[in-house]
C-alpha cells in the first residue's frame, strides 16, 4: 500500500523511472595507397540505473549482446548476461531474457578494397552484458564482478562489403573463440567449424 501511494503517476498511469549513460568511442586510421585501407576500432560502455517507480530498467531499454552490430561470432541476444548459458532450449526460444543493465564491448576491423565496389574485412569482437544486481533466475551468473574480463564473449571473422556510393550491404562470417557460457577453464573454445553468418545494412562502427 505504502509503495503504491508513493509511486509517481502521469495522467493516472504509473511510469518507469530510469537513467542511461553510454560512451561510444570510435577511431579510424586510413593508410596505404590513396588511403584505401583502414583500421577501425570501437569501445562501448553502457550503464542503466532504475530508481523511483522502477526496480529494473524497462526491458526495451536494456542492453543485449551478439548480432551484426555487436559481437558477431554470437547470434543476436544469445550472449550473456554474464556467464549464464541457456541449457534448456536448443532453439534460442528464451533469448528475450538475455539482457542486462551493463554492456561492455570492443571491436577492431581491418578494411581493404577488393575490386570495384567490393570490399573485404578481417575483424575481432569482444563483449557481454551483465546486471548490477544478480537475478535469482540466473543463479547469480549474470552479476557484474571484477572478473568481467574472463566473462567476455570473443570471436573473429572475415567480411564482404558491397559499397555503392556509401550504401553498404555487409556480410560477416564469424566464429567464437571464447565463450563465457562454458565452465571456467573451458571457455577458450575455437569453434571455427560452427561460424555465424551476419547480414546487415551499413557498417557496425
Language-model-detected regions and their locations in the chain:
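C-terminal outer-membrane beta-barrel translocator/porin domains of Gram-negative envelope proteins
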Residues: 1-112, 123-126, 130-133, 137-142
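Residue-level signature of outer-membrane beta-barrel architecture
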Residues: 27-29, 110-112, 162-164, 173-175, ...
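Repeated loop/turn-to-beta-strand initiation elements of outer-membrane beta-barrel proteins
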Residues: 32-34, 116-120, 162-171
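Membrane-embedded beta-strand positions of outer-membrane beta-barrel proteins
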Residues: 41-43, 108, 120-124, 160, ...
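Flexible, small/polar- and glycine-enriched "cap/hinge" segments at structural transition points
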Residues: 125-127, 132, 157, 161, ...
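Strand-loop-strand
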Residues: 136-164
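Outer-membrane beta-barrel "beta-signal"
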Residues: 162-166, 192-205
